[in-house]
């Protein structure tokens, strides 16, 4: 799911959060957020070092552009020199930073970059803000190495990092679990589940599918997102139900990924992050398809 759009989803739930209580509740949640974000996590640095192997570098480039979603315009940008600033008023101002060798890529060691991907913590051991590490920290060490190695090949960009601030409302939404801003708090650091080697199976597809739940819900049946703005597009059902993918073929699914066109000929809303999906390779597409068609069929809206 595109990251800034998750903010739009969560902002819609603000009235519900406010209705839970008065100033005391606000203070408690803001204080809890600040305390959590100031925590220093003492994770050892993974023993991962960059590689110059062309195959490793190619794998890293692919992951950055596809499953990682890093190169999206609303993330780090096509050249990874930093994304556009998304201003959400009193909720937050978010800018994905420059991660080339002219930015954070030079400030972090290989191990620190690997730890960031696996545990969602910065160089100083404190939590990242907003980056969806919980959707990609299943990548095995060799894939993490590939990403780190690719970052080391990026051109030096002197582009300055944009603002990254979280307002009172954003802190409340995070503590209400309506929006993930405090990244490290959401990760099970002691039992990190790692994907098997890439293969066109539902077993591997389950990990890829983690990136779908933000919009389509835990059951993948779609439907209106609770508290979302009225003008936000409604996520589709992507389970094998009659209201979802029943009757679809793998060819239909590939057309959706490549052209953004549904089986019925209708185009997807731009809300769907097609710039990342279109770069998925055949193994990833088949794995995700096999997974989506294996999950329990749920009627549309049973999120």
Where are the regions that the model predicts?
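Electrostatic cytochrome c docking/interface patches
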Residues: 38-66, 177-209
């Amino acid at each position: 799911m595109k990251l800034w759009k998750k903010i739009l989803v969560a902002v819609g739930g603000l009235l519900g959060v406010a209705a839970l209580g008065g100033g005391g509740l606000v203070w408690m949640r803001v204080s809890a957020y600040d305390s959590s974000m100031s925590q220093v996590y003492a994770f050892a640095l993974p023993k991962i070092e960059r590689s110059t192997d062309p195959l490793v570098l190619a794998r890293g480039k692919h992951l950055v552009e596809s499953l990682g979603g890093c190169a999206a315009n609303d993330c780090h940008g096509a050249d990874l020199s930093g994304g556009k600033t998304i201003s959400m008023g009193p909720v937050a101002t978010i800018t994905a930073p420059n991660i080339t060798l002219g930015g954070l890529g030079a400030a972090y060691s290989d191990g620190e970059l690997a730890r960031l991907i696996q545990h969602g913590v910065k160089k100083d051991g404190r939590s990242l803000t907003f980056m969806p590490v919980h959707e990609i920290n299943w990548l095995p060490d060799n894939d993490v190495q590939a990403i780190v190695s690719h970052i080391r090949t990026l051109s030096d960009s002197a582009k300055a990092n944009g603002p990254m601030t979280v307002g009172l409302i954003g802190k409340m939404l995070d503590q209400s679990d309506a929006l993930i801003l405090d990244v490290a708090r959401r990760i099970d650091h002691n039992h990190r589940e790692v994907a098997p080697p890439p293969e066109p199976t539902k077993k591997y597809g389950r990990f890829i599918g983690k990136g779908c739940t933000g919009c389509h819900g835990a059951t993948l049946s779609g439907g209106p997102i609770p508290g979302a703005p009225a003008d936000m597009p409604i996520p589709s059902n992507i389970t094998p139900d009659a209201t979802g993918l029943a009757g679809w073929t793998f060819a239909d699914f590939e057309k959706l990924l490549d052209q953004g066109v549904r089986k019925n000929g209708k185009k997807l809303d731009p809300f769907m992050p097609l710039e990342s999906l279109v770069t998925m390779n055949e193994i990833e597409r088949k794995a995700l398809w096999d997974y989506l068609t294996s999950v329990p069929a749920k009627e549309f809206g049973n999120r």
